[in-house]
């Protein structure tokens, strides 16, 4: 086998792996993207919070995960942070874009919340928002 053929096989395998991972990611994220606006759930769970505060928090979340700002309405207070992370990074062992570290940094600076200190496997966006409200109040 020539070096050129070997290189083509390696490139085809790498392309296939990237393509497969991207298809898994899109399928996993579709569960979030196909939802109607979750604003009503946020307002029911946090009736005393102004919409602008909730939107600001969700903007931090979608920014940390690298999603478009318009996607913030797709997330519910019951969504687990790790479910979002795993939907974005479906393949174990591949490098990620450090979304959790970015989220932790963006929550600590303005809100004083240490994500890694308070993080549990099942922590939800609503739990994080409640911590922010508690630290502000």
Model-derived regions: residue spans:
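Phosphopantetheine-dependent thiolation modules in NRPS/PKS and related acyl-activating systems
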Residues: 2-109, 113-137
């Amino acid at each position: 086998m020539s070096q050129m053929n070997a290189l083509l096989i390696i490139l085809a395998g790498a392309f296939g792996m990237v393509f497969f991972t991207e298809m898994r990611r899109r399928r996993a994220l579709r569960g979030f993207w196909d939802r109607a606006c979750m604003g009503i759930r946020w307002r029911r769970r946090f009736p005393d919070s102004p919409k602008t505060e909730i939107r600001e928090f969700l903007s931090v979340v979608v920014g940390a995960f690298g999603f478009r700002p318009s996607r913030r309405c797709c997330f519910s207070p019951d969504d687990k942070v790790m479910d979002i992370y795993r939907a974005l990074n479906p393949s174990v062992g591949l490098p990620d874009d450090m979304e959790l570290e970015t989220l932790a940094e963006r929550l600590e600076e303005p809100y004083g919340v240490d994500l890694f200190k308070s993080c549990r496997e099942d922590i939800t966006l609503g739990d994080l928002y409640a911590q922010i409200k508690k630290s502000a109040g």
